[in-house]
């Protein structure tokens, strides 16, 4: 078959016999699909020109999809205040099976009736429903667990206080993060790596993409702790020594620094002048330290409020070398900021676990910690107190939000794993404030105990701000006019969580082509049944605006697109025939790198919006390393609705966009193998072997035999491979297809993964 001067030969694959339930084979239909897909890619230059010169052109395709039933819900009063808690026995094991009547709740020491109680499994769909509303307007689905959405994954944040991290601590932290990404990240987990300095930039967002998280780790840099001493003194003064002088806690410390001042002062220099210099020096150090600490608190509180947009419980690992909880009476009281952080954490469903990144730490500082030596021992007591004092803030953050603090260990990657295990289950309880005292303008202390079990340890957030007080901590927002359609689209495009008013699915596919090199295909799918139709020319027509952008890892858009899709209703609304979807495809040339594709949709009649986003890494094929294209799942012949200049109505290949498949169906997939070695002379056939695996919740449940890819093609730079997998024996649920290719000549490996759902 000749296409624009390029010869394409049909694929021939030799596969060993295998079980029917995991059949790996190439069908004639799949062979045709590969050829059609290559054809589509080869005429890419035409498609790109049309998309740029005529952004309003419709590229509409339809395919059937089963409708989904809505869930029954129970609505709970908006005044409910809820908190989660964990109960542990003396051995540190979670105590399961407790009932509501076994708990005693008190607010500011006064008994409070429990209005709602339930044991929750972290990462479940039940948890997502229970904690779906940050203002406690809880919409609680009836208990109908389903296999499809049984595991929503964990929401985890690693917040690195890099303004208080030494180089050694940063090295340990990087090692811990890398170990977590490679070995502990679950298929449905959403993880964010954030820092006080903001060095991570655009990559500081929730994702399950390992490449994004590794790139975020690579951006971590040490920030030298620049608390500068503006005086002529050479004797180092630590922040805690400065605080001791400011508070007048230890006369010996003050006397030591005054004596050191006199040693370098001119003859007959008054001792009183040195006393003033020492006090001023201490205050200057504390002012600078307070500014850095406030920056850390502000960044952490901002993280708490941003994470409130994500439904479900969140675990935050706060990593720091520690800092002072108090910087003296002349600086702002940090305890007020801590109460705001605690309140924001409770409202966002956040539990903070703090890690002292200094590792094994005796608590006593020495010369390596910039502490002067006093032969008279006047600094000894203060030095002993300095280590624990630097951990007070870490202890308070963990204690007040229901977490724990890790201290004095060099291997905190294992502790992270332990925390993830111990927080896998918890109890959720809620109450309704019933008197004026609970709505007064102050911080409310929460206490919970298990009746008859004083040996149990109960961990929970220690308090919250009343509604009035919480409102005072937020900036005043003036009334704003209703957003325009353009603003609504922009808000949906930049939303932290996908908008679901218009159910929108996104598929991003990388493919390398002979004429155009790397190509990115963006497929946007919209469910037609949710759209508002109006009669135009005797037909029921809906209009949907679509905008999208491909953004690089610096947050800079490299390609944008927009269009309006006009969709005809082919059957009465609500009928099975109308349960279809519309797919819009946009193709663009792309250079190697890490990209995020964001799309937003808007029903022009109802104003409802939808959004989706996806990361993709484009390999640099010029490095001649073994690589794979994206996995293309599903296969269906559809009719194009392209207008003038195209083959209108000609059947085309459309791969699945939402990756949803029916039980007892088959899962076709296609991938392309790049840069397979051909021996030292470059003339030998590639010796490439391939294996497919299906995973669920991180566990391999099916594996195909290793198969040699035997092909008869002229372009060995792009070796196509496809297969079909029987889904007969798999229950409904969420899965991952992983395809791994091994080049026996170079011993290189490459793999690609794609999620799919069996309904």
Language-model features and meaning:
Residues 1-2, 24:
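Methionine residue identity
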Residues 2, 17-18, 31:
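Extended hydrophobic/Leu-rich segments
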Residues 24-31:
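Positively charged n-region of N-terminal signal peptides that target proteins for export
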Residues 33-45:
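Bacterial N-terminal signal peptides
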Residues 11-23:
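Acidic, Ala/Val/Gly-enriched low-complexity intrinsically disordered segments
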Residues 49-759:
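Scaffold/interface architecture of coatomer-like assemblies
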């Amino acid at each position: 078959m000749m296409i624009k001067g390029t010869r394409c030969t049909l694929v021939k694959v030799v596969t060993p016999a295998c079980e029917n339930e995991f059949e790996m084979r190439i069908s004639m239909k799949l062979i045709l699909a590969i050829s059609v897909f290559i054809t589509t890619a080869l005429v890419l230059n035409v498609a790109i020109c049309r998309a740029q010169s005529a952004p309003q052109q419709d590229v509409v395709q339809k395919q059937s999809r089963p409708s989904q039933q809505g869930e029954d819900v129970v609505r709970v009063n908006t005044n409910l205040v809820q908190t989660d808690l964990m109960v542990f026995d003396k051995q540190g094991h979670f105590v399961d099976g407790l009932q509501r009547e076994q708990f005693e709740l008190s607010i500011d020491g006064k008994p409070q009736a429990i209005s709602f109680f339930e044991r929750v499994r972290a990462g479940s769909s039940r948890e997502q429903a229970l904690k779906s509303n940050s203002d406690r307007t809880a919409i609680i689905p009836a208990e109908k667990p389903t296999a499809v959405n049984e595991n929503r994954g964990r929401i985890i944040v690693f917040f690195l206080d890099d303004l208080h991290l030494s180089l050694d601590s940063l090295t340990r932290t990087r090692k811990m993060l890398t170990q977590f990404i490679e070995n502990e990240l679950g298929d449905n987990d959403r993880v964010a790596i954030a820092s006080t300095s903001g060095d991570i930039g655009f990559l500081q967002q929730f994702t399950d993409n390992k490449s994004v998280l590794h790139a975020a780790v690579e951006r971590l840099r040490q920030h030298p702790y620049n608390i500068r001493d503006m005086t002529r003194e050479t004797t180092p003064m630590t922040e805690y020594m400065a605080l001791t002088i400011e508070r007048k806690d230890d006369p010996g410390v003050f006397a030591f620094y005054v004596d050191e001042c006199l040693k370098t002062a001119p003859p007959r220099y008054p001792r009183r002048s040195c006393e003033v210099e020492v006090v001023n020096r201490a205050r200057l150090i504390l002012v600078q330290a307070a500014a850095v600490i406030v920056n850390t608190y502000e960044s952490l509180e901002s993280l708490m409020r941003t994470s409130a947009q994500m439904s479900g419980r969140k675990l935050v690992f706060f990593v720091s070398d520690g800092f002072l909880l108090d910087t003296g009476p002349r600086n702002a009281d940090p305890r007020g900021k801590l109460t705001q952080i605690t309140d924001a954490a409770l409202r966002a469903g956040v539990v903070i676990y703090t890690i002292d990144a200094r590792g094994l730490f005796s608590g006593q500082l020495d010369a390596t910690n910039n502490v002067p030596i006093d032969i008279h021992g006047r600094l000894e007591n203060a030095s002993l107190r300095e280590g624990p004092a630097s951990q007070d803030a870490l202890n308070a953050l963990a204690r007040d939000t229901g977490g724990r603090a890790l201290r004095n260990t060099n291997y905190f990657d294992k502790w992270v794993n332990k925390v993830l295990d111990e927080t896998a289950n918890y109890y959720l309880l809620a109450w309704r404030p019933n008197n004026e005292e609970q709505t007064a303008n102050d911080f409310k202390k929460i206490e919970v105990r298990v009746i008859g079990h004083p040996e149990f340890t109960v961990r929970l957030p220690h308090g919250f701000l009343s509604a009035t007080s919480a409102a005072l901590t937020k900036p005043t927002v003036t009334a704003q006019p209703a957003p325009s359609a353009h603003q609504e689209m922009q808000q949906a495009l930049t939303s932290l969580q996908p908008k679901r008013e218009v159910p929108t699915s996104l598929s991003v596919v990388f493919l390398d082509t002979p004429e155009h090199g790397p190509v990115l295909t963006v497929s946007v799918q919209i469910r037609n049944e949710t759209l508002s139709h109006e009669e135009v020319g005797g037909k029921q027509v809906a209009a949907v605006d679509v905008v999208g952008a491909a953004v690089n890892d610096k947050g800079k858009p490299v390609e944008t697109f927009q269009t309006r899709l006009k969709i005809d209703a082919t059957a009465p609304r609500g009928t099975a025939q109308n349960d279809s979807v519309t797919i819009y495809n946009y193709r663009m040339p792309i250079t190697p790198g890490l990209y995020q594709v964001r799309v937003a949709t808007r029903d022009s009649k109802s104003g409802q919006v939808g959004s989706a986003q996806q990361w993709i890494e484009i390999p640099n094929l010029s490095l001649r390393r073994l690589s794979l294209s994206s996995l293309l799942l599903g296969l269906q012949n559809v009719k194009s609705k392209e207008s003038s200049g195209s083959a209108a109505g000609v059947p085309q290949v459309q791969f699945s966009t939402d990756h949803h498949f029916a039980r007892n169906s088959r899962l076709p997939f296609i991938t392309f193998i790049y840069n397979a070695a051909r021996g030292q002379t470059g003339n030998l056939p590639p010796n490439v072997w391939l294996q497919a695996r299906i995973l669920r919740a991180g566990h391999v449940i099916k594996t195909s035999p290793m198969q040699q890819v035997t092909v008869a093609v002229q372009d060995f730079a792009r070796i196509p491979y496809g297969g079909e997998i029987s889904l007969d024996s798999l229950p409904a649920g969420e899965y991952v297809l992983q395809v791994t290719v091994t080049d026996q000549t170079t011993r290189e490996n490459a793999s690609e993964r794609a999620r799919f759902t069996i309904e």
